[in-house]
């Protein structure tokens, strides 16, 4: 198994698919990386040489924010919004939907499991 950006990527899959196992790399970025390095799209990870794996690793480290750094940056952005006290920050703090969705009904994913109200009978 090749280890890129701290992630063991599967060896039997094509390089473009295997790179998507890294947090922060989707289909577009995976294709960009393989084109930069000059690896054919149909090549599988177990067919890569050590030099090619090193080139991929260097390209990712140089050009992209991935894995822990990306997660840290996203959480810092959310924390900054909450510290500012802006509307989006308040919605994050209250664990409600941030992007204008209705909350009277629905929004169960963000709000969590429904809490029963004591004494309410039908």
UniProtKB/Swiss-Prot annotation:
<keyword id="KW-0687">Ribonucleoprotein</keyword>
<keyword id="KW-0699">rRNA-binding</keyword>
<keyword id="KW-0694">RNA-binding</keyword>
<dbReference type="GO" id="GO:0015935">
    <property type="term" value="C:small ribosomal subunit"/>
</dbReference>
<protein>
    <recommendedName>
        <fullName>Small ribosomal subunit protein uS13</fullName>
    </recommendedName>
</protein>
<dbReference type="GO" id="GO:0019843">
    <property type="term" value="F:rRNA binding"/>
</dbReference>
<dbReference type="InterPro" id="IPR001892">
    <property type="entry name" value="Ribosomal_uS13"/>
</dbReference>
<dbReference type="GO" id="GO:0003735">
    <property type="term" value="F:structural constituent of ribosome"/>
</dbReference>
<comment type="function">
    <text>Located at the top of the head of the 30S subunit, it contacts several helices of the 16S rRNA. In the 70S ribosome it contacts the 23S rRNA (bridge B1a) and protein L5 of the 50S subunit (bridge B1b), connecting the 2 subunits; these bridges are implicated in subunit movement. Contacts the tRNAs in the A and P-sites.</text>
</comment>
<dbReference type="InterPro" id="IPR027437">
    <property type="entry name" value="Rbsml_uS13_C"/>
</dbReference>
<feature type="region of interest" description="Disordered">
    <location>
        <begin position="94"/>
        <end position="122"/>
    </location>
</feature>
<dbReference type="Pfam" id="PF00416">
    <property type="entry name" value="Ribosomal_S13"/>
</dbReference>
<keyword id="KW-0689">Ribosomal protein</keyword>
<dbReference type="GO" id="GO:0006412">
    <property type="term" value="P:translation"/>
</dbReference>
<dbReference type="GO" id="GO:0005829">
    <property type="term" value="C:cytosol"/>
</dbReference>
<dbReference type="InterPro" id="IPR010979">
    <property type="entry name" value="Ribosomal_uS13-like_H2TH"/>
</dbReference>
<comment type="similarity">
    <text>Belongs to the universal ribosomal protein uS13 family.</text>
</comment>
<dbReference type="InterPro" id="IPR019980">
    <property type="entry name" value="Ribosomal_uS13_bac-type"/>
</dbReference>
<comment type="subunit">
    <text>Part of the 30S ribosomal subunit. Forms a loose heterodimer with protein S19. Forms two bridges to the 50S subunit in the 70S ribosome.</text>
</comment>
<dbReference type="GO" id="GO:0000049">
    <property type="term" value="F:tRNA binding"/>
</dbReference>
<keyword id="KW-0820">tRNA-binding</keyword>
């Amino acid at each position: 198994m090749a280890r890129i950006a701290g992630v063991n990527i599967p060896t039997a899959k094509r390089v473009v698919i295997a790179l998507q196992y890294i947090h922060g790399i989707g289909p577009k970025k995976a294709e960009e990386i393989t084109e930069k390095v000059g690896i054919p799209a149909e090549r599988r990870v177990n067919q890569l040489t050590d030099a090619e794996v090193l080139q991929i690793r260097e390209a990712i480290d140089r050009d992209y924010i991935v894995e822990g750094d990306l997660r840290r940056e996203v959480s810092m952005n959310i924390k900054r919004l909450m510290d500012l006290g802006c509307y989006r920050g308040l919605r994050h703090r209250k664990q409600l939907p941030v992007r204008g969705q209705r909350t009277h009904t629905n929004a169960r994913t963000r709000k969590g499991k429904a809490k029963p109200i004591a004494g309410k009978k039908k």
